[in-house]
UniProtKB/Swiss-Prot annotation:
Group of enzyme by EC: transferase
EC code(s) of this entry: 2.1.3.15
Species per Swiss-Prot/TrEMBL record: Limosilactobacillus reuteri subsp. reuteri (strain JCM 1112) (Lactobacillus reuteri)
Keyword Nucleotidyltransferase: no
Biological role: Component of the acetyl coenzyme A carboxylase (ACC) complex. Biotin carboxylase (BC) catalyzes the carboxylation of biotin on its carrier protein (BCCP) and then the CO(2) group is transferred by the transcarboxylase to acetyl-CoA to form malonyl-CoA.
HAMAP family on file: AcetylCoA_CT_beta
Catalytic activity: N(6)-carboxybiotinyl-L-lysyl-[protein] + acetyl-CoA = N(6)-biotinyl-L-lysyl-[protein] + malonyl-CoA
Protein name: Acetyl-coenzyme A carboxylase carboxyl transferase subunit beta
Cross-referenced InterPro entries: AcCoA_carboxyl_beta, Acetyl_CoA_COase_Trfase_b_su, ClpP/crotonase-like_dom_sf, COA_CT_N, Znf-ACC
Length: 289
């Protein structure tokens, strides 16, 4: 086939990529939208983004992709009234660039920090809801996050409501130092007061739930659920291996392995969560009458 005036010659006489080919390749790349194709972190299946349902679940292995809090909210509940959306961190350690990073993420996520809290309902079952957002500094636990979750439990205790909390976190936020770690104890105390009032607390562990969140309120629930293949643990895999100087099993920190050892009550697919939560909330409310 003869080469036309506008055709692209892939290689020159020296068998190297031609300048015209590089330009054409760049133009083609610019026409492909970002996130058009995704690779499942668990089974490594290549996924066409437009074929994913609203639940953002891998059709091959049921792994739930990491999604923003408001995305989860859109299919989880029937109504929602947001709490404490104006709370702001004061950058207590004056960490360089931290305030700018927070401001940028606030614009992107429409959240003031890494958790969305409020009063929600599913089929007339009213409850207090918290959803941690892995797109906001990996759902890390800072002072505002801890304060919002604490206030959520205090509201639930006062109004005698169950609490449902979706966890997704890399742990305590390093930019806030010891003040971040203090949130673990503060939230746990609010949970203790909620439990003392005889009220139900349901946790749903999503990918990833690690660090100080796992070491505190993620494991304090009366009922602990988890999404398929969610990473759940305290220290990261590399930290563990560097500490004990040996490899750990690939599934050691998987939700399935933790279920096997009795720390999780049930693995629930994302598309089944709303129905299961409705049943649990209804059962809990009857038991509490």
């Amino acid at each position: 086939m003869e080469e036309g005036a506008d055709s692209v010659k892939l290689y020159d006489q020296n068998n190297t990529l031609s300048e015209r080919h590089i330009k054409a390749d760049k133009n083609a790349d610019e026409r492909v939208p970002d996130q058009m194709w995704l690779r499942c972190p668990h089974c490594h299946q290549l996924l066409f983004a437009k074929q994913l349902t609203q639940y953002a679940v891998c059709p091959n292995c049921d792994y739930g992709l990491r999604i923003p809090a408001r995305h989860r909210l859109s299919w989880l509940v029937d109504s929602f009234k947001e709490f404490d959306k104006d709370l702001q961190t004061k950058n207590p350690l004056h960490f360089p660039g931290y305030q700018e990073k927070i401001s940028k993420l606030q614009r992107q996520t429409k959240l003031n920090d890494s958790v969305l809290t409020g009063e929600a309902s599913i089929n007339d079952q009213l409850f207090s809801l918290g959803i941690m957002d892995p797109t906001f500094i990996m759902g890390s636990l800072g002072t505002v996050t801890g304060e919002k979750i604490t206030r959520l439990f205090e509201y639930a205790t006062t109004h005698r409501q169950a609490v449902v909390l979706f966890t997704a976190s890399g742990g305590a936020r390093m930019q806030e130092g010891i003040m971040s770690l203090m949130q673990m104890a503060k939230v746990s105390q609010a949970i203790n007061e909620h439990a003392a009032a005889g009220l139900l607390y349901i946790v749903v562990l999503t990918d990833p739930t690690t660090g100080g969140v796992t070491a505190s309120f993620a494991m304090d629930g009366d009922i602990i659920l988890a999404e398929p293949h969610a990473l759940v643990g305290f220290a990261g895999r590399r930290v563990i291996e560097q500490t004990i100087h040996q490899q750990i099993p690939i599934d050691l920190q998987s939700a399935e392995n933790i279920l096997h050892h009795g720390f999780i009550d049930r693995i629930v697919k994302r598309q089944d969560e709303k129905k299961l939560l409705e049943w649990l909330l209804k059962t809990g409310s009857v038991a509490n009458e």
